[in-house]
Curated annotation (Swiss-Prot):
Keyword hit for Flavoprotein: no
Organism: Dictyostelium discoideum (Social amoeba)
Catalytic activity, EC: 3.1.4.4
Function: Hydrolyzes membrane phospholipids, such as PtdCho (phosphatidylcholine), producing the free headgroup and PtdOH (phosphatidic acid; signaling molecule on its own).
Protein name from the UniProt record: Phospholipase D Z
Enzyme class (EC, first level): hydrolase
Reaction catalyzed: a 1,2-diacyl-sn-glycero-3-phosphocholine + H2O = a 1,2-diacyl-sn-glycero-3-phosphate + choline + H(+)
InterPro entries assigned to the protein according to its UniProt record, in alphabetical order: Diverse_PLD-related, PLDc_3, PLipase_D/transphosphatidylase
Domain PLD phosphodiesterase per the UniProt entry, residue ranges: 148-175, 357-383
First and last residue of the signal peptide: 1-18
Catalytic residues as annotated in Swiss-Prot or TrEMBL: H153, K155, D160, H362, K364, D369
PANTHER family: GM01519P-RELATED, PHOSPHOLIPASE D - RELATED
Length: 422
């Protein structure tokens, strides 16, 4: 009860401190984000000839080195240090930088909490064990025992309840140096970040129970959702509207929008264009037994293209671990008028040996003519019905234009190939 009371005080303290300013359209924008910013952060694999404005490494360093009170991390796993065993040309130092920044933050009295998916032999917890020995609070969540299947797949970092990262990058040196990633860096925006903190708190609390609550209660109630978005002033005086969405349904608390609902709504709201960049796309489950057809996303895309004439472009990853069932569905979509599907292929690293499970576009985002969607989930049924994930759903013309430019850069790059290639 005391923990819940303190959490409510922290949450509603942020809301009370939020002054609102009316604009000419009658919308009310929260001034507690004045001086705040939102940026796109990318990881461009070494030896890939693409340019980005802000790297994931630099975004994380900015967050961690400037933390004053707290760092809360909801993650799949952490392997930041094992790249240090390789030749420096592979980029392992980037992970060591982040690990050292966490150690330094802990040393200067910053409270660090990490909740991770239950470790396994393939996903060891060496780094988090070592951090725990230094006093970092670490919890592991046995996801299948709570949900029935799936994993905690989220990648979110919340700092001082005012700044955050959310995106595709795992806490892994490979995600900084050898895998293509995309996420969002929020700075100095208490209202939206405190709402993101609620999702972290759900993971943190779920790690110490044997059964999920049927009703998450008022302390986990969302501040914003699809019908009541946060209205923010960011990047100077730019007006943003946005909300956080959550999967799976078992973690959708009161007033929270489900992730698949947010995704399909964005597709349904597009009037001109839908551009998708994601590692896996399949209108079915991938990890169930048996796997089953799940056309929720597919129907929305086909309806957008066929019924409304929306131009749909899909950039899907092809790599050593592409599931054999995926290409047939993409070939089918590519036959629909107004839908164009291409593969994105990251070439092997110039040096040998190759690092396993790298050299892939791991991003999970969509940009339409109306909005941006930046998430942590691959696009198959499993990720939305039994796997832990989050997304930021963002309405702002300039941000959407920037994300569109990134998509167009990749679409027109030498790493993009017709879907008929595979």
């Amino acid at each position: 009860m005391m923990m819940k009371l303190l959490f409510l005080i922290a949450l509603f303290g942020c809301v009370v401190n939020s002054i609102r300013i009316n604009n000419d359209n009658g919308l009310s924008f929260q001034s507690n984000c004045l001086g705040g910013s939102i940026q796109i952060a990318e990881s461009i694999p070494l030896a890939l000839n693409l340019q980005s404005n802000l790297s994931t490494h630099d975004a994380w360093m900015e967050l961690i080195t400037n933390a004053k009170k707290s760092i809360d991390m909801g993650i799949f796993y952490m392997t930041l240090t094992d790249g240090g065993q390789l030749d420096p040309v592979y980029g392992g130092q980037l992970g060591l930088d982040i690990y050292k920044a966490l150690v330094d933050a802990n040393s200067r009295g910053v409270s660090i909490r990490i909740v991770q998916n239950q470790p396994s032999s393939s996903m060891p917890d060496t780094d988090t064990q070592n951090l725990a020995k230094l006093g970092v609070q670490v919890r592991s969540i046995n996801w299948p025992s709570l949900v029935g299947a799936g994993i905690l797949h989220t990648k979110v970092i919340v700092v001082d309840q005012v700044s955050a990262y959310l995106g595709s990058a795992n806490l892994d040196w490979r995600s900084l140096a050898q895998v293509k990633e995309l996420g969002v860096l929020f700075q100095n925006c208490p209202s939206m970040v405190s709402d993101t903190e609620i999702a972290f708190q759900q993971y943190w609390d779920a790690a110490v129970v044997t059964e999920l609550p049927s009703d998450w209660g008022v302390q986990y109630q969302a501040a914003y959702n699809q019908t009541n978005m946060a209205s923010l002033l960011l990047n100077g005086n730019e007006k943003f509207e946005m909300f956080l969405a959550v999967s799976p349904p078992q973690f959708v608390s009161t007033d929270r929008t489900g992730d698949i609902d947010a995704l399909v709504s964005a597709m349904n709201g597009a009037t001109k264009t839908i551009c998708i960049s994601v590692m896996d796309y399949i209108p079915a489950s991938l990890y169930n037994s048996p796997n089953t057809f799940w056309p929720v996303m597919d129907n929305a895309l086909r309806a957008a293209a066929y019924n409304r004439g929306v131009q749909v472009r899909m950039l899907i990853s092809h790599w050593n671990h592409t599931n054999y069932a995926i290409p047939q569905w993409l070939h089918s979509l590519d036959q629909v008028n107004n839908i164009d599907v291409r593969w994105f292929v990251v070439p092997d690293f110039p040096n040998e040996p190759q690092v396993p499970f790298t050299r892939v576009n791991h991003a999970k985002y969509m940009v339409t003519d109306e909005q941006s969607y930046v998430g942590t989930s691959n696009w198959s049924e499993d990720y939305y019905t039994n796997t832990g994930g989050l997304s930021y759903n963002i309405y702002n013309d300039e941000f959407t234009s920037q994300l569109q430019s990134i998509f167009d850069r990749d679409w027109n790059s030498p790493y993009s190939f017709p879907v008929t290639t595979y």
